[in-house]
Amino acid sequence: MDKRLDKKYTKEWFILLGLLLGVTVTNGFARFAYGLLLPAMQAEMDWNYAQAGWLSTVNALGYIVGAISTMFLVQKFASEKLFAFGLITTSVVLLMTGVLPTLEAQYALRFFAGTFGAVSFSTAGAIASGLFKENARLNALSIAILFGTGGGFGIILAGAFIPTLIDVVGNSAWPICWIIIGLLSIVFMPFGIWSALQIESSKPSRLTRNEFRLLKMLPELAGYACFGFGYIVYLTFLSAWMTGQSIDATMITTIWVILGLCICISPFLWRPIFARFGNGIPLAMVLSSIAFGSVVPLLSPAFSILILSAVIFGSSVFMAPGAITNFTRKNLPQEMWAYSISIFTVLFAISQTLGPYVAGLIGDYFDNIGMGLVTAFIILLLGALVSLSQKELSKN
């Protein structure tokens, strides 16, 4: 009988499904649904650009706080417990986002969404790395599915109903959208918690300076920081461009669903690469693909070009977390996985905070938002080149 079909593997696939739904909440909903709802929130609540911009900033700051906290928490608590805690708290925060509409409450909720989401997202990869230990190909596929399909599924769900509901009801529907997202999160939450409880409890990380070879991982770390800087510029541009072009709800839904679908199928495209390489090549290839997907819109403002861009970008963007998780699993002992991924997440959180700001300054200087995309393109390619120099490490 095919090992994929025996009882042991069947249970592991269900565990992966639960983890995937957790990532749908903490990544797909908590981070990317906000981009769809911000224009309606800003118009209905009469926020200026500075107020709306600070909502993104406090969310990014919360993500930094959560990522840094996870670095220390994984040395005291098992990854499974931290994942469940982050999933529960993020689900509650998303529901409350639709209940408390004041600007002050939104600042606090966006901060906590970033903080709790980072805790759960950072530990999800470490948990998934322990699945299918006897089968390198299935292990690589499970890591890719976790980040790709998990985040992509959230984008598909949010993109399928938010633009249409806003178009039919009006901007005043934004709290309803958040409540729907919150309720979906609460529905998904038990599956994620169940999956975490099925995993054999991992030992908290116990590290010394000599055990964690940070300097030998610098190319991979630098490449991932470049990913954080570059990818967020594109997503910021995508929302702004479609809003500025007065694209109707059907076309906006089409773009987001295509983007989400490509993210969902991306694990199957990248699985052979993850299974084959334990060095910096997977991250370098992912960053190169994201870079070219980001710059495609500059070729033409045509809607078809934007679709092409979404396909290229969506097929690779969520594979960067998968690439660094795959690198961690293949190069470090299991007790170091969560700590390693949390360090990657801290760098990512900081760089994604700086990305839109720097790109915005460049766009303002040239009076052309396209120059921000060019900047992201250059940074992503630079990250790809640096990642290529990353060699495999010895686990011993």
Can you name each region flagged by the protein language model?
Residues 93, 104-113, 304-312:
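Paired small-residue
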Residues 329-368, 376:
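A late C-terminal transmembrane helix in Major Facilitator Superfamily
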